[in-house]
Amino acid sequence: FLSVWNEAAEEGARGASVDNINTLFVACLSATGTETTLTEANPAAPVAPAVIADAGLTATQLAIKATIKKADDSYRIRFMTPVRSKIGITIAARVPTSYVATDVEAQIREAILAEYGQAAAASRRGYNRPLYQRVYALLKQKIVALSGGNADLVVTIQDVPTMAGRPELWRYVAADSLAVTVAT
């Protein structure tokens, strides 16, 4: 996960401060996963990121800092803890009786988790927000049972206003935040 933002985005999320002038903010989690993260269990109760002191930076964070400094050494760089936040998605599908409901349910889960799960490329960038249009198109493209004229699909994506403009959020769909029902 990697998210980099400037003082305007930071002040949009947490208010103005003179400490933010000429600062780039970074929240990251490397492949080794040694960086500290916070978890937001309830999106209606936001968890604020913590500032990571320079002495507590990991090798990955130090490499990111060096790369930014090499490109432009006029910026101050402040690392923040990423905040994990699961995206709740509910999918209700109706398919023709010629399909096995449990098989279609497994295909839906596989498609959503591949596209929006924790390991997905889209989730590893900041500001991940599944859009209804993309979810419907993805499911109809990947799952034959949903592409026919006798299939129906209803998708509900949890969207909490407090999530808007929070660049430190690592948002992804998890197996336990995805509810799927399929009827024939």
Enumerate the language-model features and the residues they cover.
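Carbohydrate-recognition loop of C-type lectin domains
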Residues: 1-129
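An aromatic-glycine-centered, glycine-rich loop/turn in mixed alpha/beta architecture
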Residues: 100-184
